[in-house]
Amino acid sequence: MQSSFKVFLKKSMPLNETIKHHGLIIRVAIPSPLRRVFDYLPPIVEQLSIKPGMRVRVPFGKREVVGVVVESAQDSTLLPNRLKSIGTVLDREPLFSSALFRTLLWAAAYYQHPIGEVFQTALPVKLRSTEPVKVDTTVYRVLIPLDGDISTLLKQAKKQKSLLELIESEFEVNENRIKNAGYSRRTLNQLMEKNLVKRYMVASERVAKFKPPTSASELQLPLNDAQKVAVKTILKSSDSYACYLLDGVTGSGKTEVYMQLIQHQLANGRQCLVLVPEIGLTPQTVSRFRERFTCPVVVMHSGLSDAARLDAWNHSREGSAAITIGTRSAVFAPLANPGMIIVDEEHDTSFKQQDGFRYSARDLAVMRAKKENVPVILGSATPSLESLQNCKANKFKHLRLGERAGVAQPPTLELVDISQSILESGFSEQLLFKTQKQLNANNQVLVFINRRGFAPMLTCNSCGWIAECNQCIAQLTVHAKPPGLRCHHCGTIEKLST
């Protein structure tokens, strides 16, 4: 793998003369501020074969840490008696695909960050210790086949009958599949109470891959000419790398373009990764995707518990999740069979990690798509200058959606000079008049204000302290009703001390 991998190792290894060894040397990336890998001997007790991307527990100074295997070699800068042995091999197989592994090596070199910390960032919190990757997963199977007697029993319970038919047709389903299909927990419990369905615990690797949709969704909307051109152009390279900047005005139907492209990938059994800039956008995005597609959709962002993030990570890695939606950290989500990466609102600065391992999720998404050999779509109504320059340099392909989709019309804008006006609670006479006119016609009015909250920040005048979010280091905004501090970046809420 002579590429950024070897280049990184050459740069990170000490300049001492190397010593040939008769046995195997394992190079491990340790989560430390040192920009290098560390040499170890294989475990004293024979274990599984060690491959790059597997976690190992190793002695490091006076403590033991969990690192990631980078490569094996026949030489080291240390004498054999100075090398320590790996304590435990924690995984049966690499946690990263070859493409994702190479993306992380590239990121460490490009962003000049210690390789061990890069690998740690890419892993869920629970996997940064000795937590096993494989977790037991709950699945449900039919105990009694759906025959005439059972159909009669469930004649008045149509929801129960259709859920039973679903489980029987797929042999076994997990809770995500049941939820995504629109069935409640109560319906499932009623089937179990009647001894028609039983719950089983199985290892996560036995959970079946998602079932590709057999036909287009009934919710699919007709495309205008510009949308058709965008979809047709992107589908030409649906099996190989290409980067597209989907430049569309607000309301131009970028999401519908995403949906139809994803539909094509799912029909071919391939997974899709969708990145959104903020946690606040995730629920509405997930809701639209789950309503549109019957395939499992998982979510990955910092607001989830460690256990929930590991579960989503596992489903994505094993291929049981068809679509993974998340914020910037989801760019590291493992995909069993990747088909497409989408970065919505690619211009948003929230895609940039500002502390620790500093990276741009948008740029990493492009590089990862290149390593995975899949298309990547960057969507925006106000594209970043970097992306526009890449289009000029023919690195990206520029697709424009210049008109609003459907029957939507561009708004009529009116600029009101309030410098000489008397305002009422901050509103001009013209605004109040036109607002009342719409209300009298039973229409709705949406008023945007230039600031959310009572005050933009909470600060101490004596020492200059500013209240910051413990989750993402953004400034907290003061809200009066209800009183509290809120992070407009990640959604964290804290009490307002008096």
Language-model region placement:
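A polyampholytic, Gly/Pro-enriched intrinsically disordered region
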Residues: 317-324, 421-424, 495-497
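Short, charged/small-residue-rich alpha-helical element at the C-terminal edge
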Residues: 249, 432-433
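Short amphipathic alpha-helical segment that frequently serves as the phosphate-/nucleotide-binding helix
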Residues: 43, 362, 428-432, 466
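Accessory, non-ATPase domains that flank or precede helicase/AAA+ motor cores in DNA-metabolism machines
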Residues: 1-380, 387, 392-408, 439-440, ...
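Cys/His-rich short segments
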Residues: 431-432, 440-498
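C-terminal boundary of histidine-terminating zinc-finger modules
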Residues: 415-428
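Conserved coupling segment at the C-terminus of the helicase ATP-binding
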Residues: 382-383, 468
